[in-house]
Regions:
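PP2C/PPM-type serine/threonine phosphatase catalytic domain
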Residues: 1-235
């Protein structure tokens, strides 16, 4: 019989004056575990509102029996409705990464650059697409047009190609994966990327709060908000 899943989350506003990340986790009636992380943008009021509204709408849709795509649609619609006619929320939006995990399978949907990592045997693998400019910039390194340092510090690296803003979505990533016995899943905001992938993998054996603390310990100036939701098999 397949084991169940358990999860925990932690977050910190880092070196920013406010927190724009939101997250949630729910156990559903069929035993599935739902988790979601949203990283808002659009200033204090806008970013925080967008991520909170998106998380609430997404969770509500899934709890009412909807699929992941229904959750994303409701989240996108809710962000658009909330911003309509409110100048202080103009241009607000959020990333979104959500999973449903049950037994030996994870299903996910995502928009934006918030990573979904799978950790197995100490190796970290990002399994969702990155909808920022980072993949295109990294491709220039492979073509010899930029150095790795230039790519890492490129001013457009974190520019999003897609976000949940109430507009039609042209980029959405979704998929599923069979899971081995000792894997862990990490849903994160991109603030975690202050750490290198081997550092994230090493910290994944510890509680989610320890990974957040490792990010803060790196001492990056103006550290972005960081959120980590860690899922693992219940023992």
């Amino acid at each position: 019989m397949a084991t169940g899943w358990r999860g925990e989350g932690a977050q910190h506003q880092g070196g920013r004056p406010y927190q724009e990340d939101s997250w949630a986790m729910r156990t559903l009636g069929d035993g599935s575990l739902l988790a979601i992380v949203c990283d808002g943008m659009g200033g204090h009021a806008g970013g925080a509102t967008a991520s909170k509204v998106a998380v609430e709408a997404f969770v509500r849709a899934i709890e009412q029996g909807g699929a992941l795509a229904d959750g994303l649609k409701d989240a996108n619609d809710a962000v658009g409705r909330t911003a309509a006619g409110r100048s202080e929320l103009s241009g607000m939006g959020t990333t979104l990464v959500a999973v449903l995990v049950r037994g030996d399978e994870v299903r996910w949907i995502s928009v934006g650059d918030s990573p979904l990592y799978l950790v197995a045997s100490g190796v970290l693998e990002r399994i969702n697409e990155d909808h920022s400019m980072a993949p295109q910039i990294d491709a220039l390194v492979k073509r010899g047009m930029l150095t790795e340092e230039e790519a890492e510090n490129h001013p457009g690296r974190h520019t999003l190609r897609e976000a949940v803003m109430g507009q039609p979505l042209s980029l959405t990533d979704k998929g599923s994966r069979r899971l081995g016995p000792d894997v862990k899943l990490l849903l994160c905001s991109d603030g975690v990327e202050t750490l290198r992938e081997p550092q994230i993998a090493a910290a994944a054996i510890r509680p989610a709060a320890a990974l957040v603390e490792a990010v803060l310990a790196a001492g990056k100036e103006y550290q972005d908000n960081v959120t980590v939701v860690k899922l693992e098999r219940a023992r």
